């Protein structure tokens, strides 16, 4: 599902059962695995040199691992990885990788706690 006014870069890769809410920018070279939720107004970036990388410089979008959840208004820096079943709270700015099954929040995003077992997505059979 892709929400209204959202844009997906031509080189982005999306898995199955991905939900992209309204007004999301999913940049090229982003990788989104199965069962991911992306809240409204999320912005991803893929260029940490702001077009001044020089010869051989490559763009790198974020990677969102299986069943992670990204809250509204989150900003994901180039190349960050959001771990499997991780939760990024609304308004966070993620500049470093987020470990699997953790909750992060803040600017910059910091680990607050682990995601409780009862909040994990059960694998589909």
Listing of model-derived features with the role each one plays in the protein:
Residues 1-105, 110-111:
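Structural signal for interior beta-strand "rungs" in well-ordered beta-sheet cores
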């Amino acid at each position: 599902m892709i929400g209204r006014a959202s844009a997906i870069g031509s080189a982005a890769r999306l898995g199955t059962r991905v939900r992209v809410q309204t007004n999301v920018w999913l940049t090229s070279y982003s990788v989104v695995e199965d069962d991911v939720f992306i809240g409204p107004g999320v912005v991803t970036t893929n260029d940490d040199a702001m077009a001044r990388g020089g010869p051989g410089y490559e763009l790198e979008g974020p990677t969102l691992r299986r069943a992670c959840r990204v809250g509204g208004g989150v900003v994901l820096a180039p190349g960050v990885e959001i771990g499997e079943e991780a939760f990024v709270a609304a308004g966070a700015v993620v500049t470093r990788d987020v470990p699997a099954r953790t909750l992060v929040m803040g600017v910059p995003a910091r680990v607050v706690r682990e995601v409780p077992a009862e909040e994990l997505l059960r694998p589909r059979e």
